[in-house]
């Protein structure tokens, strides 16, 4: 009837496919009305496309990179979602189950009250760690100053820190350039 009832994006990370022999087709931006025919048609389209490209596993919801939103909200619908999180309607989880999708990892968010002053003991431990490891805190005003001072090596630190995280893929040079322009 010409009415938009859903959307989905299929993504193949060519670097992961070639270097790690990763056979996952990623899906994201998966939104749909509460109609199983719609959700199954959308997901099956990505699955079939992925198979035609040699992929064997559906992985999502994720984005183009690991810095994009990912995951499915399963509880906590009565709270305001943080800006860095995805939001979806409660019926999504039923659709995912009916589509045969299973949870592979848990992402848990907490609300933390930050104290107005750093506790004295924490300050002492921090100073001890800095001293022992010959580290320093470099104060910068903004992301542009970080880029000017450190260039793209800044992203090497991010890649190293994120490496142990679920499903992480290091950033390409092009992605580093792109993200450096956002801030």
Specify the residue positions occupied by each region the protein language model found.
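Conserved beta-strand in the GNAT
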Residues: 3-13
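Acyl-donor binding region in acyl/amide transferases
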Residues: 19-100, 105
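A non-catalytic, amphipathic alpha-helix used as a structural packing/dimerization or gating element
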Residues: 41, 45, 153-160, 178
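Conserved GNAT-fold acetyl-CoA-binding loop/helix
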Residues: 163-181
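Asp/Glu-centered strand-loop micro-motifs enriched in Gly/Pro and often flanked by an aromatic residue
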Residues: 11-14, 29-31
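Feature marks short, surface-exposed loop/turn motifs that line or immediately flank catalytic pockets
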Residues: 14, 64-68, 116
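A short helix-loop-beta-strand connector motif used in the catalytic cores of GNAT acetyltransferases and
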Residues: 1, 181-183
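Acyltransferase donor/substrate-recognition loop-hinge adjacent to the catalytic core
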Residues: 86-167
